[in-house]
Amino acid sequence: MPGKAANRFAPIVAALQWDRGRWIWLLIILLLLGGVLGLGDSISALFRYDRSAIAAGGWWRLLTAHIVHLDAHHLILNELGLVLVWALFAQDYPAEEWCAIVFSGALAISSGLWWLSPHVSWYVGASGVLHTVMAAGTANHLATRAWDRWILLLGLCAKLAWEQWGGHPTPLVVVDAHLYGAGCGFAVGGALSWRTAIIRRRSA
C-alpha cells in the first residue's frame, strides 16, 4: 500500500522538482516582463494590440501586445499565472516546442481578435498566451494519460465557458483572447503530442 501511494503522487513530486535550468529561465522571463512595464506608458502604447495602428502598418503589435501590461497589478497576476503553469507543464515539451507553442499562440490570439472580434480596439497582457500554454500542457497530459488529465481539461473548459457566458467580473479582461489562445494550445499541443506518440511507436 505505501508503495502504491508513493506511485500515485510521483507525478506531483516530479512536476515540482527543482530543475535549475527551467526555473532560471522562468526567472529571466519574469524579470523581462517586469522590465518592459518599467519602461513606461510610451512603450506600452507602442507595443499594445491597437486595431487602428495595426491597420496603419504596426504589424509588430501582433506579437508585442502579449508582453506589455496595464499596470503592476495586471503584471503580477499574469506572473503568478506563469509560475503556476510553469510548475505544472514546463516538463511536457522541450524548449524549442514551447517556443513554437507560445509564438503560435500569440499569432493566433492577435489574428482571432483581428478577424473574429472586431469590437476589440486594443489589448495587452500575457493571459491569452498563458491559456495557450495551459491548453497545450493539458493536451500532452491527455495524450500521456496523466492522472490529472480530466481535472485539467474540465477545469479549463469550465473556465472558458464561464467567461464566454458573461462570468468575468471586469470588462477590461478580453475573454476572447483566452478562448483563441486555448484553442491554439489544444491544436498545436495535440499535434505535437500525436507526432511524439507516432515516433515512439516506430522506435519501439
Model features per residue range: what roles?
Residues 65-87:
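Di-metal (Zn2+ and/or Mg2+/Mn2+) metal-binding site signature of metallo-dependent hydrolases
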Residues 16-19, 87-97, 141-147, 198:
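Membrane-interface helix-boundary motifs at transmembrane edges
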Residues 42, 68-71, 114-124, 165-173:
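Membrane-interface helix caps and helix-loop-helix hairpins in membrane proteins
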